[in-house]
Amino acid sequence: MNVILLDKVANLGSLGDQVSVKAGYARNFLLPYGKAVVANAANTEVFEARRAELEAKLAAELATATARADKLTALEAVVIASKAGDEGKLFGSIGNRDIADAVTAAGVALAKSEVRLPLGALRTTGSFEIEVQVHAEVKAVVKIAIVAEA
């Protein structure tokens, strides 16, 4: 099934690309989520008329994501207090939700799905640099300091 993409789709293409995908992928994901339209003559004309509007929308999303990334990078180390043993090993761990909540409390909104912990949850005290993906093309680094509760 041929479709015209209305948004950037990972491993498929970007705005305006005409791609061939399996019918089930188009019917169950691309079309219901508004990421594509069926490639026929009528939809092609409508898309070409809306192309500038869609490109402006994508550019605006990228600009807001870049602004958020700058705010996140400008943050000083976000301190998270957690119970820990004598050697700095935490009782429990600090995960995506804990980091997102701490950064949001520091003043910049952050969703837990944007936090990237490739090595898993943090289990020791200390300072860490956490990668945050605010947009498909924009990443930021947030400094986290985990300290033992008194």
UniProtKB/Swiss-Prot annotation:
A GO MF term = structural constituent of ribosome
User: Where in the sequence is the signal peptide annotated?
Assistant: none
PROSITE patterns, per the entry: RIBOSOMAL_L9
| Pfam families associated with the record | Ribosomal_L9_C (PF03948), Ribosomal_L9_N (PF01281)
Sorted alphabetically, the Gene Ontology BP terms of this entry are: translation
Per its UniProt record, what InterPro entries does this chain match?
A: Ribosomal_bL9, Ribosomal_bL9/RNase_H1_N, Ribosomal_bL9_bac/chp, Ribosomal_bL9_C, Ribosomal_bL9_C_sf, Ribosomal_bL9_N, Ribosomal_bL9_N_sf
Q: Which NCBIfam families match?
A: L9 (TIGR00158)
Q: Which family does it belong to?
A: Belongs to the bacterial ribosomal protein bL9 family.
Query: PANTHER family of this UniProt entry?
Result: 50S RIBOSOMAL PROTEIN L9
What does the protein in this record do?
Answer: Binds to the 23S rRNA.
Q: What is this protein called?
A: Large ribosomal subunit protein bL9
Q: Which organism is it from?
A: Shewanella frigidimarina (strain NCIMB 400)
Which gene is transcribed and translated to give this protein? rplI
